[in-house]
Amino acid sequence: MDTYDSQGPTSRRRTSNLKDYFVSATPLQKRLKLARRQSSVFPSPSRRKIPQCSQLQEDIDPQKVAFLLHKQWTVYSLTPLYKFSYSNLKDYSRLLSAFIAAEKQKGLAVEVGEDFNIKVIFSTLLGVKGTQRDPEAFLVQIRSESQSSREHRQDKVLWTGWFCCVFGENLQETVSEDFTCLPLFLAHGAESNTSLIGGWFQKTFDCCFSPLAISAFNLSWMAAMWTACKMDHYMATTEFFWSVPCSPQSLDISYAIHPEDAKALWDSVHKTPGEVTQEEVDLFMNCLYSHFHRHFRIHLSATRLVRVSTSVASAHTDGKIKILCHKYLIGVLAYMTELAIFQIE
């Protein structure tokens, strides 16, 4: 069973001033809003496509995909990067390495240890996109080499973050060539390192990170869409977690369902081939509520859904996500990209 941190994402001075950021960039704000109205990529809130395996995934390095899976990522939305260039990734690696070393020299909270040589590596994630027009995703890693491990030349990964845009190419078309739109950022590692690196990106590319909370409404959609995915074999039980506010402390309820039973339930309410509708999501969740009430006499509709876990992925309202299935990597990221774009608008 996955464990999730109860701590919220690190607060940053600019995070709470997202609207202020757009006040100083009014033309960009207008273009983003226009994109949302005109874009045919983002379906209406009442209807979405069932995630499918993308042909572009064939370009993804299998080792990099394996590294992305089965890790708990904290998700953020990110405003467009100004003057970012893929041809300068080596320079960014050098500059960020120097920045981290300088911050550590100042005695700031940089969790890299005492006896390590730190290096930062920027690399592209080819194939992590929805269409050819989406900007390339890229990965940032903080690696270290201790005195004792130099003979073996094995680097230890201390922190990882990646930036992507999946089926969000219309957003890129609304901004000038000086901006690169990668609205979804995922981080794994010490929160202090996330804050430090986020600060460097904000200063270097005039962008703004904001923690991406996932609502109970969004979790219901995730549960339905991921249950609808056809699996070659199921790797995990389908689980739901609800929070019950009560005194003196909150009560949590977990509900585990065999994945084949969950799929059978979904098939019984699913009527629109290739799509998921709001009505089907509501029916799916209401059937779960009714079944639970019949057995335990508890009204789950009076509680708050805080986490869902399937063989495709798991997600928490705290903005934590874990992708479990390579086949549906792009499908999961597409929905997360949509949520990130809606948040920055």
Swiss-Prot record:
It is found in: Nucleus; Chromosome, Centromere. InterPro entries: CENP-L. It comes from the Eukaryota. Coiled coil: none annotated. The modification Phosphoserine is found at residues 40, 54. The keyword Nucleus applies. Keywords: Centromere, Chromosome, Nucleus, Phosphoprotein. It holds the Pfam family CENP-L. One of its GO terms (cellular component) is inner kinetochore. Component of the CENPA-CAD complex, composed of CENPI, CENPK, CENPL, CENPO, CENPP, CENPQ, CENPR and CENPS. The CENPA-CAD complex interacts with the CENPA-NAC complex, at least composed of CENPA, CENPC, CENPH, CENPM, CENPN, CENPT and CENPU. Belongs to the CENP-L/IML3 family. Component of the CENPA-CAD (nucleosome distal) complex, a complex recruited to centromeres which is involved in assembly of kinetochore proteins, mitotic progression and chromosome segregation. May be involved in incorporation of newly synthesized CENPA into centromeres via its interaction with the CENPA-NAC complex. This is Centromere protein L. The lineage of its organism: Eukaryota, Metazoa, Chordata, Craniata, Vertebrata. The gene is Cenpl.
